[in-house]
Each structure stands twice: as structure tokens, then as C-alpha cells.
A protein has these predicted regions:
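Short, conserved "active-site rim" segments that organize catalytic pockets and cofactor/ligand binding
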Residues: 7-27, 44
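N-terminal hydrophobic/helix-forming segments and targeting peptides
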Residues: 2-6
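Glycine-rich phosphate- or other oxyanion-binding loops that anchor nucleotides, phosphorylated ligands
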Residues: 7-10, 34-254
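Assembly/interface hotspot detector across virion components, adhesins/toxins, and nucleic-acid enzymes
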Residues: 29-33
Length: 254
């Protein structure tokens, strides 16, 4: 990794395209470059240099993406941003959570220590229309579909208010590189809410859900259409709130 300078960018790691695009819309100017077959967006947010990429879902992809971004951009700090599920009745869909710790699911990385963000949550500039929660985050090995699964995980990890699939390995690589980091997650589904489909069945080799396979699945289950429309609308609104929160945090570093 190159030596950090005052012009080193802020790194932003997302998991899927929808999250990345919402943040990429903030970059002006913006340029695209590739390194080792991975696409990176480089540009500025209100004059502050940033470098942005996505990993795809899952531990190994997240770890590779973190290593790649650190090597490609030599960031001075890292923002891990994207979607999450709620593990608490008090954390609602459409809200933002900035975890005060992140843990790894035991079936992914047994006996690994909890990691604490090295950038304090209080550094994030607040906006009136975005509700920000605190609480722990657990990184799991799959998309959690049913309320019963959420309750079981929450019972094992009572201090965790949200769940994702990428944050722990991303934070772990930042720790190894001695790069300050923070997590910004937007809630796509409530604690007492089942997902409209088992999206695990439609994840492609790139770690993204296949739009064509999801569309086919919905056509075969036409009664799911209203729930999918509602889910998609909320996901886009949540992606925009994630981008707003990331924007405000970047401004706080200026």
C-alpha cells in the first residue's frame, strides 16, 4: 500500500450495485478505472477525493474487495456501506444504523473477537429526515429470510441490532492495514417481517441477485408482486438514505 498523503482518498466499500450506484451519483467529477479485473470509481464528493467499489455478497468477496480497494487507492479511512436486516423491534426498515461493534457469525468465523469502529459515530453529521440507530452488527453467511431465523440469531447475539454478510471481513482488513473505519447500514426489512422471496436462490457468481431470475420467480408467484414492489421501493429509498449519510460523514471529515 502506498504511503498515505493529505490527498489520499476516503475509501467506500459497498456490497451490491444498488448501494454503489446511489453513492456514485454523489461523485463529481467521476472516473472509472480497473485493476486486476475489478472496477473502481474515483472522484470527489464536495471536493473531497473518494474511491468506491462493490464486493458482491458474502465473506470471501468482501475480504477480496477490501484488500483490492486498500491496494488500489491507499485510502486514509474506510466507510463500509450498504443494506442490512433488523435484529431488533426498535430498528425499523428505512432507518440507518451505525454499529458500535461488529461480530462474525460462529458458523463463519468461530471465536473471532468483536471489532469496534475506529471512527466514532458522533463524527457523522446528522440530518433531520434520517433516523440513525446504534447497536451491534452480526455478519452472517446468508440472507436471512424468515422472522424465526432473525429471532434465533438475536437470541444468540442479544447486543446485535442488525445483520449483514460483509462488514466483518471488510473491517478486519481495515484493521490489518491500520486504516480507520466505520460502518453505515440501511435497514431493508423489519425484525418481524419475512422477505418476499428467498433471494439466496437467485444469487449469481458475481455475488448479486439476478434480476432476470427474480423476475421469473415473481411471475411464477404472482401473489408476491405487491410485496416485491413495496420491497423494491423501500430498498431504493434506503439506498438513497445510505448515500446521504455517507455524504454527511465525508463532509464531517473535511
Amino acid at each position: 500500500m502506498e504511503t498515505e498523503s493529505k490527498d489520499s482518498p476516503i475509501g467506500i466499500l459497498t456490497s451490491v450495485r444498488q448501494e454503489m450506484v446511489a453513492i456514485a451519483c454523489l461523485l463529481n467529477p467521476i472516473s472509472l478505472f480497473k485493476r486486476n479485473g475489478v472496477s473502481y470509481y474515483h472522484g470527489e464528493i464536495d471536493g473531497i477525493p473518494v474511491i468506491l467499489t462493490r464486493s458482491g455478497m458474502g465473506w470471501e468477496r468482501a475480504q477480496r474487495a477490501a484488500n483490492g480497494l486498500i491496494g488500489a487507492g491507499s485510502p486514509k479511512s474506510l466507510i463500509i456501506a450498504g443494506f442490512a436486516a433488523s435484529l431488533s423491534p426498535g430498528v425499523k426498515r428505512g432507518e440507518i444504523i451505525i454499529p458500535d461493534c461488529v461480530q462474525a457469525s460462529q458458523n463463519l468465523a468461530p471465536d473471532t473477537p468483536s471489532l469496534t469502529p475506529s471512527i466514532p459515530m458522533d463524527d457523522v453529521i446528522r440530518t433531520p429526515h434520517i433516523h440513525i440507530n446504534k447497536g451491534g452488527l452480526i455478519t452472517h453467511d446468508r440472507i436471512v429470510i424468515h422472522t424465526s431465523e432473525k429471532r434465533a440469531i438475536a437470541g444468540v447475539h442479544p447486543n446485535c441490532a442488525s445483520l449483514d454478510m460483509e462488514s466483518y471481513p471488510m473491517a478486519m482488513e481495515a484493521e490489518k492495514a491500520k486504516i480507520p473505519w466505520i460502518i453505515v447500514r440501511g435497514i431493508t426489512d423489519d425484525f418481524n417481517e419475512d422477505m418476499p422471496l428467498d433471494f439466496n436462490r437467485y444469487v449469481g457468481a458475481n455475488g448479486e441477485t439476478s434480476a432476470s431470475l427474480v423476475a421469473l420467480a415473481v411471475c411464477l408467484r404472482f401473489w408476491k408482486i405487491p410485496a416485491m414492489i413495496d420491497f423494491g421501493k423501500n430498498a431504493q429509498q434506503t439506498a438513497d438514505k445510505i448515500a446521504d449519510t455517507v455524504h454527511n460523514f465525508i463532509l464531517s471529515l473535511a
